[in-house]
């Protein structure tokens, strides 16, 4: 199997036009494509993302992309009245304009929502879910049973896992609390699945990568936090690009 050139970005928050990408085989975006998921924000991102010079382009949503999980607007009255003004019209479920956009994606662009795709014998699963915090955010699940039910849906033969949330202890430390806020339940599930690569975002100040050790005969998993924006929502981090061989598990940064 050939080396695959992979680029990872995340948490672009409407700043995608300020990002220059080198091109390659696979482009992955780990969510928070927008500020709050308004139509013009999503439309601008998809137009930009679709034009990038990659063979396959994959994205998920994040907690900011409210219209992808717009039932959040109806879970709490304060959220409803605070944010309903931004959506046209208010709906319980994905708005029709978003459904239409996702149905019209180019054949080389994929949106994953607790779902999988496969190409060239590479199996990829993606999810917008992250552990609950605050109120009114999209795709939040309580830690423990609720979020584990989502992670249990990751097929055991998955090669690449894409989530908005990082895993616990890897590129997940916040600067204001100095605590690791990633998902321990996801960490345990990845140890069961043993994918090659894991891509996440969400914690802007925790940009970077790490290796999760497995048994020697399995090889390590590489995990990445590709947040493009810093805490001030300024594009401050470079896209993460590397060549990867799924047979030898060899990774070389570009």
Where are these regions (language model features)?
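Conserved catalytic scaffold of divalent metal-dependent phosphoesterases
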Residues: 12-17, 35-36, 63-182
């Amino acid at each position: 199997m050939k080396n695959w050139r992979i680029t990872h970005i995340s948490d672009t928050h409407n700043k995608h036009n300020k990002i220059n990408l080198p091109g390659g085989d696979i482009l992955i975006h780990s969510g928070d494509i927008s500020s709050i998921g308004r139509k013009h924000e999503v439309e601008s991102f998809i137009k930009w993302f679709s034009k990038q010079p990659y063979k396959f382009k994959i994205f998920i949503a994040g907690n900011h992309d409210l219209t992808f999980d717009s039932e959040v607007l109806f879970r709490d009255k304060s959220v409803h009245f605070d944010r309903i003004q931004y959506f046209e019209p208010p709906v319980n479920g994905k708005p029709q304009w978003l459904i239409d956009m996702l149905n019209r994606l180019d054949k080389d662009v994929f949106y994953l929502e607790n779902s999988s795709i496969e190409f060239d014998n590479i199996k990829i699963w993606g999810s917008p879910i992250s552990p609950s915090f605050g109120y009114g955010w999209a795709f939040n699940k309580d830690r423990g049973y609720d979020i584990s039910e989502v992670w249990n849906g990751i097929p055991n033969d998955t090669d690449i896992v894409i989530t908005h949330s990082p895993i616990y202890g890897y590129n997940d430390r916040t600067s204001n609390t100095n605590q690791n806020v990633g998902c321990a339940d996801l960490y345990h599930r990845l140890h069961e699945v043993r994918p090659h690569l894991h891509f996440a975002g969400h914690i802007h100040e925790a940009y970077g990568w790490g290796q999760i050790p497995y048994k020697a005969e399995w090889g390590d998993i590489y995990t990445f936090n590709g947040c493009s924006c810093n805490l001030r929502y300024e594009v401050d981090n470079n896209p993460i690009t590397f060549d990867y061989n799924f047979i030898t598990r060899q990774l070389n940064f570009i």
